[in-house]
Amino acid sequence: MQNRLLLIGGGHSHVEVIRRFGLNPEPGIAVTLVSPDRHTAYSGMLPGYIAGHYRFEDCHIDLETLCRSAGVTRVAAAVTGIDLQRRIARCADGAEHAFDVVAIDSGSTPVIAGIPGAAQHGMPVKPVPAFLDYWTTLRAAARNAPSDLRIVIVGAGAGGVELTLAMHNRIRGDNGRAQFTVISDGPTLLAAHPAGVQRRFSAVLRERGITLRLNAPVQKATAESLVLGSGEVLRADHVIWVTGAAAPAWPRECGLLTDAAGFIVVNAHLQSPSHDCVFATGDIAAMTSAPRPKSGVYAVRQGPPLTENLRRALRGGTLLEYHPQRRALALISTGDRYAVASYGRLAFGGAWVWRWKDYIDTAFMQRYRVAETS
């Protein structure tokens, strides 16, 4: 009888698990991926795609082809819960999938639950497929607009700033009409990065005519505006939510140990302390012994140790500990072919940094392109 490994979500860690099981199959183990989308975006290249520097296939991994080449069964469905006692995952379509060991790498969505009207008005940047459909519509609207569209991005972290600059670059190249505003409830943009990075991006936003509003929490969203904490009404034709990460409700509801925000708690083995048959990585996981920001960099690094521990868990072996790096290099693009590096207190930028970033990103994607065509 085969052991059953179930992978929930096609995130950055899981594509590496699939690749490695394809390169080195495990006798007696049947691997299944459950993910609603055929293509998974590589977050490092997504702003470049928005900006017009990459094609869709340059920055998306075809999960169907990758799974087929690795001997992994792919199920196109979204998991809505787990019966931990029976070891069964339930999907939105009513299907159930049994497992002996399950790994969860299904990502997160922007935090909007506490803002009245946010779910009805505006577009969260995740899930990515829905956002990309919206982006196509927005580009067409900007090309055909008789006057500037008022586009507001809520969130001034690296994701929000990089996305804003990418959209600005593409719409400008389309000869579209748009005025961008970035707003944040905090006192600075790029709060997780050093002052040198903040200064560089503040200058870039100014140079491109993009308005930055700090200390401006959103209290309410309507069809035509955002109401700020000060009571000011900010008119908006389009609102894009790039706020902090939010977890889905089902991990907590099914009985997994989660943190205060609902993310799945994992130990140094990337394993749930409450249920040893469950592993989690990426945004949906909270490594409480070594907290790190929600970033694709860490999800990528978790792929190899996750693969090894899944093999060991299925064999009944001793698990390895994973110790994430204390700080990660961030290469943040400015919409054009220029990027700024942020590492600890260091900050430097240039066209050569963008080429460096492009080299790293395309090399990452090539790993999965080789697997897809094998």
State each model region's role.
Residues 8, 97-109, 127, 218, ...:
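Short hydrophobic core segments
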Residues 336-374:
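C-terminal auxiliary extensions adjacent to catalytic cores
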Residues 120-147, 233-238, 242-301, 308-309:
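FAD-site-proximal beta/loop scaffold in flavoenzymes
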Residues 135-181:
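Rossmann-like NAD(P)H-binding beta-loop-alpha module
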